[in-house]
Amino acid sequence: MKTLSVLPLLCFQFSPRNVESSIKYFLVQSFRAAIILKLALMQAWLYSSWSVVKTPKFFISSGLIMALGLKMGLFPCHYWFPDVVQGAGFLQGLLLSTWQKVAPLVVLGYVCKCDKSRILLIMGALSVLVGGWGGLNQTQTRKILAFSSIAHIGWICVLISYSFRVRVIMFLVYTIINSRVFLLRKEFGLTSLSMFGRLLNYNPVRGVIVVLGVLSLGGLPPLFGFLIKFLALECLVYEGAFFLRFILVLGSLIRLFFYLRVGFKRRLVYFPQHSIRMFVWRRKILNTRVRYLYVLVLRVLSGLNLLGILSSPLLVSFLKK
């Protein structure tokens, strides 16, 4: 039902790229649903149980984790996700990167409730690395955000086996930061990296706001994105997962590198142009109330994003309860 409800939103503009993105998403999700249904029937036939809390056989739980990883775009089933996000609009990409991942994460939490799943840990850790390496050679902002989504969901999947509170807070923080970045890029039409340099020349204040959102998504201290990664690493150290922590830090540093490139390199090497040619001058005029609501949402998200280290006592006290 979620897949069928998202398909009209993906092809809302009815362009060739939107239709292609919708078809890819439908085929992938149909294949995933068929796998889950097959595994459920096998478990009901062999063990007379429909529960996913504790599956009796390894191959059933492993197949279920792989199918849910396919839905979220985890490694090694991540190839479809960047193309679908690139073909969709910014709002549709935001929907695929946040809301569509809630149900699979909840089911994974039930599957791994009793014991730690090594397959999920491996998929999550490798997703962080793939999310970092995949974004290095990209110039389209939606593909960069797609690989960033793969990496962040990898972090959350690793934390599923360790801490419920940390993974919930991390997903909420990721949703806030990602929503802000997607909405700002939609507002200013930032479809490629070259547009960042133009925005900084055209309106430095807005350009700095966008760059801060991007750097927060990459985890640069003392912004909000760094705080939640620090708490996640503290949780992994407490559990003794030192090698896993090393992999996550390595993937995050790689991802932070291309976010720094987005924020600074285009500013330094972009050839100066007149601001009259920076952006398309014909833009849609929104309704006054819709416009005010849109600006209010962006300001709230920007304020939450810039809290950073100031909100650390509140989060630490919540986690220690």
Identify what each model region corresponds to.
Residues 1-321:
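Alpha-helical transmembrane segments of multi-pass membrane proteins predominantly involved
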